[in-house]
Regions:
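Conserved coupling/interface region of RecA-like P-loop/ASCE motor cores
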Residues: 1-48, 62, 189-190
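Accessory C-terminal helicase-associated subdomains
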Residues: 37-133, 181-185, 193-198
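Generic detector of well-ordered alpha-helical segments enriched in charged/polar residues
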Residues: 4, 16-24, 31, 51-58, ...
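Short, flexible loop/turn elements at secondary-structure junctions
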Residues: 5-7, 48, 73-77, 131, ...
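C-terminal accessory regions
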Residues: 121-211
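Short secondary-structure junctions and interdomain/linker hinges
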Residues: 10, 26-30, 60-69, 179-187, ...
């Protein structure tokens, strides 16, 4: 896959360390690390309104057609599909757009097509999962926080019936939160105040109005 740009963020090391602490539930350490990341270089936000996240990305990169933004979600969070982050659906040996049109969906155009192309990630029509984006980056991902990761009694509880499956969920969110070159926006659905409180504790800001 030819992304035509480097997939290494200049703040990748610092962001990776922060994400590791966040996912481990070590919130004080995560907050201390976040405060050291230059905010002018890497922007981390959360929002409870998906439409605002989409509007922010479109406005921020309106005059930068080379930039890429899109929606990414956990493969074990189907509830996000009903909230505006649908995934491509599996058919016989192929994936299809979730609108029922029968149009085939492929991951390469999602990353590579021009920002005004309907198959581009910038169309904000289809969300991809950790399996589609592992090892790849876009400039500003909108990360959907799913029902498979909950903050209960001051620690994360990830969906899974054994240590191996839980490890997969932990790694999933580690992947999702480290796909951005310019930053990330986490969409936290209504009713998930547990997650919003965590993001406030580690000093991640609410998505601002675009100037």
């Amino acid at each position: 896959m030819d992304l035509k740009v480097s997939i290494r963020s200049h703040t990748a090391g610092e962001v990776s360390n922060f994400v590791n602490k966040l996912i481990a539930g070590e919130l004080e350490e995560a907050a201390a690390l976040l405060d050291k990341i230059p905010q002018q270089d890497f922007h981390m936000y959360y929002t409870r309104d998906l439409s605002r996240a989409k509007e922010y990305c479109r406005g921020k990169y309106d005059h930068q057609p080379e930039k890429r933004y899109g929606m990414i979600v956990s493969s074990k969070a189907p509830g996000l599909s009903k909230l505006g982050m649908p995934r491509a659906t599996w058919g016989y040996k192929a994936k299809y757009y979730p609108d029922g049109s029968g149009r085939r969906w492929k991951v390469a155009p999602w990353f590579n097509e021009k920002s005004n192309h309907p198959d581009s990630c910038c169309a904000l029509e289809v969300a991809i999962t950790e399996f589609d984006c592992q090892g790849l980056e876009i400039d500003m991902p909108i990360v959907g926080w799913g029902e498979d990761a909950k903050w209960i009694n001051d620690h994360w509880e990830f969906m899974g019936t054994d240590d191996e499956k839980i490890s997969y969920r932990i790694n999933c969110y580690r992947v999702l939160l480290t796909r951005g070159r310019d930053g990330f926006i986490v969409f936290i659905p209504e009713g998930r105040d547990d997650v919003a409180e965590v993001f406030e504790r580690v000093h991640i800001e609410k998505l601002p109005e675009l100037e």
